[in-house]
Amino acid sequence: MGGIVVDGGNFNWDNGKFPCLVEPDESYHGISYVKDCGKAAFITKLRAHILRDIGASISPFNAFMLLMGIETLSLRMQKHCENALKVAEFLSKNENVSFVNYPFLPDSKYNALAKRILPKGCGAVFTFGLKGGKKAGIKFIDNLKVFSHVANVGDVRSLVIHPASTTHSQLTSEELKKAGICEDTIRLSIGLEDIDDILWDLKQAIDIAVK
């Protein structure tokens, strides 16, 4: 897990509510972060005190990998969104698919909103329904070759799950409906593989599932 702190330095820490930033820090040469560091008070406290105490410093190689991931995120997201849109369009034209929930599809009620606030793409995680219900959904999952059957999302690999038979299998049909999940709902997280491989895998698994 990694994270980034962005501090504009404009918050008034000297308002009586943050003594740890105002009073001298005896563990760090008696420094007063607000008085001695000015706008860098908060970020200096994180770096000089909290990071030191909790030990959340990663190895040089892991730091390098984290930076590489962050610096190339925008490039990967372009491919994620490009592949996801093509998959959504492909599924929306398949006669064995009952619905596709993807905001960039023209018939989505969120289309105009998505294009206004997410002009570069609306992500790569979405759901669709496969005619044949729960049984077809399970069969579809079992016959995929490219997709990995796991519950997480956002990987560079394409991922899939059938909630009704896995993550939400403890719910009754009525409870599934209340949760906004149909028995034929399948969740996809589209990865960076070649789009032809992704579409081929979906088609062959759908064909088998609805036989």
Task: Label the predicted regions.
Residues M1-V125, G129-R157:
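Active-site C-terminal subdomain of aminotransferase-like
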Residues R76, G133, D142, S158-K211:
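PLP-dependent enzyme catalytic core of the Aspartate aminotransferase-like
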